Amino acid sequence: MAGISIGVGSTDYTDLVNKMVNLEGAAKTNQLATLEKTTTTRLTALGQFKSAISAFQTALTALNSNAVFMARTAKSSNEDILKASATQSAVAGTYQIQVNSLATSSKIALQAIADPANAKFNSGTLNISVGDTKLPAITVDSSNNTLAGMRDAINQAGKEAGVSATIITDNSGSRLVLSSTKTGDGKDIKVEVSDDGSGGNTSLSQLAFDPATAPKLSDGAAAGYVTKAANGEITVDGLKRSIASNSVSDVIDGVSFDVKAVTEAGKPITLTVSRDDAGVKDNVKKFVEAYNTLTKFINEQTVVTKVGEDKNPVTGALLGDASVRALVNTMRSELIASNENGSVRNLAALGITTTKDGTLEIDEKKLDKAISADFEGVASYFTGDTGLAKRLGDKMKPYTDAQGILDQRTTTLQKTLSNVDTQKADLAKRLAALQEKLTTQFNLLSAMQDEMTKRQKSITDNLASLPYGSGKKT
């Protein structure tokens, strides 16, 4: 029995227990991981699918808008002199516009101060106005009675009214120069002063300015105007019009324009108001682009891609999704439907055709020709209750509505993920219980091994102590 061994005591079975627990949970863990990954991928794809549909809906809404087909464009022959825009109410036509003078704003230079570094104005009040608009009164005291202090106080008071002040130094000294953004007759800057006669070494009254009597600025220290506020003048098709602002919106019905410079005598600007054919084309192109984006996304998410002979093919996240197939069939059906009530019967008449992958392509020359030759027909094809944009939009709506098809699919997938989380938690509890059970059992086994080892040693020791156990003869 000296050579008999029945096991080794105090064995650590931790690694064995972990392997047994992992083996027990491996299949279910892999199953849940695969389900979670697939579901998450589908959820992401559905979100992107909804976004692509929404972008297509936006393009359809724009194309179905009367504003697109009723829009007018205004083009100037020289935008450095005149730039214009037009609303739907503008009538197509051509206008000859001569800019005789621009509307001007008031700019004045107050009396020069010979020694600005040492000048301290008397206490008092400045009241500045631009036409009928009065600025907040400025109180002059020791906190602001320098030239720089006056500048800052005027800028603060004139912020809302568009009046600003700066300091310019010339041969006569330094002076405040005030500017206004308001143009037109009667918008001159006026400065009224109430001088207390004390508190400084310089009369506050020197800052007074009356546009009614002030001369044009010239050499010397006296105040004067740099520019007077005055109306401008334009001539439209030979009709003269005085303008108080260089932004004009009340001369030609539905047309607004900004005049920037005076035209040369006898060289008027040509302003052309017409349909916005380019805007219509742009919206048709956006419709095609949005449709193609949606179609390409569907193609990518419903395809099976081979990745090698020894590997499983990669399938799109929405492969086999009935809602996707239904949408594709619906869109294609509407695109090939003929408009029996209009001169434009189908997309092909606009130079828009379907390619092999289901996307659309545009023959821009044919589209330009269709818009130019049959503008009303193009508008009728896309707009109204029976127009393509409305029909397609109605087909998209059930997919993107709140609690619609895609929301329901999303809710179902979210429930699946929630269920996966529940199963993962349950599996974790079950495996923890199994680990605890196995640990207990193997601890008992280890204790039994220890006991058997002790007994084996005791027997061996006893046998060795016997006379014949030592090898001696008796």
From Swiss-Prot:
This protein's GO CC annotations: bacterial-type flagellum filament cap; bacterial-type flagellum hook; extracellular region
Gene Ontology biological process terms, A to Z: bacterial-type flagellum-dependent cell motility; cell adhesion
Main subcellular location: secreted
Keywords of the record: Bacterial flagellum, Coiled coil, Secreted
Coiled-coil residues: 408-454
Localization (cell): Secreted; Bacterial flagellum
Subunit (UniProt): Homopentamer.
Homology family: Belongs to the FliD family.
Functional note: Required for the morphogenesis and for the elongation of the flagellar filament by facilitating polymerization of the flagellin monomers at the tip of growing filament. Forms a capping structure, which prevents flagellin subunits (transported through the central channel of the flagellum) from leaking out without polymerization at the distal end. Essential for motility. Responsible for adhesion to mucin, which is the initial event in colonization by this organism of the airways of cystic fibrosis patients.
Protein name: B-type flagellar hook-associated protein 2
Native species: Pseudomonas aeruginosa (strain ATCC 15692 / DSM 22644 / CIP 104116 / JCM 14847 / LMG 12228 / 1C / PRS 101 / PAO1)
Protein encoded by which gene: fliD
